[in-house]
């Protein structure tokens, strides 16, 4: 093979081919599952294209972390994915309509919902609080697949574009409050002086942390020492094991 056509082992194309091999997926099968053309998958696997707007969909079909697929950081497998290799794409668990009067299924649990709220006498200050009367239903199977104890699981609503396009503004996230020990490159929810923040977290020497956004063009890395964390009231809420996004139209589509 000519050197000019060789694919670097640390490239997007190499990781995509590795993930397809692990799942025993062909290009046409992956393309159909992710909602893209086979030509798009061909360009990505050949190295002719280095990124795609369909990153999340492709990663979901492969059952891999979109962060690992795009950057090579972290573990390849999505923490909540079921390990299969039968040549079929992964599918998301279906959503079922319900209201407060709908009884729980045997395999369901209700999780409390938290969000950032403005304090009544805080002059614009906020705090992360549970929203009374608001619950989200999860299956025990989903929590078991992620290794999450249902009694430690909560949901929270994210605001801001710092993690886009991985986690969109307005997304609901699932948080394991029992997992606060930092694994470098994993995504965690934190409370920062009353703000709910979701970031990649890395350990620093001396007990500090580095916070990294997926949208690094607008949000540079932040580093905090243990003293900074105390003075700025930064505390770990838990590991983000799941998220779900409903897109909101902000204006005319740029794609025609």
From Swiss-Prot:
Domain of life, source organism: Bacteria
A GO term, aspect molecular function: DNA binding
Please state, per the UniProt record, what induces or represses the expression of this protein: Inactivated by the activated RecA protein after UV irradiation.
| Protein name (Swiss-Prot/TrEMBL) | HTH-type transcriptional regulator PrtR
Where does the record place the HTH cro/C1-type domain?
A: 16-69
Q: Name one GO biological process term.
A: bacteriocin biosynthetic process
As recorded in Swiss-Prot or TrEMBL, the protein's gene is named prtR
Free-text function comment from the UniProt entry: Represses the promoter activity of the prtN gene.
The record's Pfam families line, in alphabetical order, gives: HTH_3 (PF01381), Peptidase_S24 (PF00717)
Give the DNA-binding residues.
27-46
> Keywords assigned by UniProt?
Antibiotic biosynthesis, Bacteriocin biosynthesis, DNA-binding, Repressor, Transcription, Transcription regulation
Question: Which pairs of Cys residues are joined through disulfide bonds in the record?
Answer: none
Which InterPro entries does the record associate with it?
Cro/C1-type_HTH, Lambda_DNA-bd_dom_sf, LexA-like, LexA/Signal_pep-like_sf, Peptidase_S24_S26A/B/C
Q: What is the lineage of its organism?
A: Bacteria, Pseudomonadati, Pseudomonadota, Gammaproteobacteria, Pseudomonadales
Identify the species of origin. Answer: Pseudomonas aeruginosa (strain ATCC 15692 / DSM 22644 / CIP 104116 / JCM 14847 / LMG 12228 / 1C / PRS 101 / PAO1)
């Amino acid at each position: 093979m000519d050197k000019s056509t060789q694919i670097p082992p640390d490239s997007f194309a190499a990781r995509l081919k590795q993930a397809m091999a692990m799942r025993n997926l062909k290009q046409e099968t992956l393309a159909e599952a992710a909602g893209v053309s086979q030509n798009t998958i061909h360009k990505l696997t050949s190295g002719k294209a280095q990124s795609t707007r369909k990153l999340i969909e492709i990663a979901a079909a492969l059952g891999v972390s979109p962060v690992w697929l795009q950057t090579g950081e972290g573990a390849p497998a999505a923490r909540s994915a079921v390990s299969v290799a039968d040549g079929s794409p992964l599918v998301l668990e279906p959503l079922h309509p319900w209201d407060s009067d709908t009884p729980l299924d045997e395999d369901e649990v209700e999780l409390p919902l938290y969000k950032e709220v403005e304090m009544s006498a805080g002059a614009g200050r906020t705090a992360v609080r549970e929203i009374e009367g608001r619950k989200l239903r999860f299956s025990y199977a989903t929590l078991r697949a992620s290794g999450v104890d249902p009694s430690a699981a909560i949901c929270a609503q994210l605001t801001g574009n710092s993690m886009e396009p991985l986690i969109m503004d307005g997304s609901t996230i699932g948080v394991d409050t029992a997992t606060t020990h930092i694994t470098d490159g994993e995504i965690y929810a934190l409370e920062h002086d009353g703000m709910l923040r979701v970031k990649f977290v890395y350990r620093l020497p001396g007990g500090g942390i580095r916070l990294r956004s997926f949208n690094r063009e607008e949000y540079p890395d932040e580093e905090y020492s243990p003293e900074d964390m105390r003075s700025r009231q930064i505390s770990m809420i838990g590991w983000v094991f799941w998220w779900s996004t409903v897109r909101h139209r902000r204006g005319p589509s740029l794609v025609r």
